[in-house]
Design a protein with these regions (language model features):
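N-terminal secretory signal peptides that target proteins for export/translocation
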Residues: 1-9
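Short, flexible active-site loop motifs that bind/organize anionic cofactors or intermediates
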Residues: 2, 20, 126
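A generic structured-segment signal
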Residues: 8, 24, 145-147
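N-terminal regions of proteins, emphasizing targeting and processing segments when present
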Residues: 8-13, 45
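Bacterial N-terminal signal peptides
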Residues: 13-24
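Sec/Tat signal peptide C-region and signal peptidase I cleavage site
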Residues: 26-30
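Compact, glycine-rich, soluble single-domain proteins
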Residues: 31-154
Length: 154
């Protein structure tokens, strides 16, 4: 007669083992980097990462330590409105241009790192473009100037 050996595994260890196996079996779900567009802001080239989802817009440029000289982020809002930006958890000084649905810059504001101040659009904005602080001023870009290459409104 064969002997049957029973092994007792403590419940906590079995739970940990099951969790570890599930973690390795689950497919990796790394967040894909935002896609980027090549914009022309009053004729000046700007590579802009696109923040089109609520999650992407909420994160924005938070925790970024650097931004290329001609790089930025394009925020695409679901509806035109008096949208506002803040600098929570954002270590870079930035400028923001609010843009209407026709691609016309409504206003441009400078923003300081790690502040909770609200920086608001001067009119119904469909987009906002964040760049390194002073990017618009250095190129003499002003309200009324046009942005080309924006994604079409829904």
């Amino acid at each position: 007669m064969d002997a049957i050996v029973a092994v007792r595994v403590p419940r906590a260890a079995a739970t940990l083992l099951a969790a570890a196996l599930l973690a390795f079996a689950a497919p990796a779900r790394a967040e894909a980097p935002p896609k980027a567009l090549q914009l022309k802001v009053a004729g000046h080239a700007l590579r802009a990462e696109v923040a089109a989802t609520v999650e992407q817009r909420m994160k924005g440029l938070m925790f970024r330590e650097k931004l290329g000289a001609n790089d930025g982020m394009l925020f695409v809002f679901d509806e035109p409105g008096y949208h506002a930006m803040w600098m929570k958890n954002t270590p870079l000084p930035l400028s923001v241009a609010f843009v209407d649905g026709e691609g016309r810059i409504l206003n441009i504001l400078d923003m300081e790192p790690h502040t909770l101040d609200q920086h608001m659009a001067a009119g119904p904005a469909r987009y906002a473009i964040e760049t390194n602080k002073g990017w618009f001023a250095q190129r003499r870009i002003k309200p009324g100037d046009k942005v080309a290459g924006l994604p079409k409104a829904k």
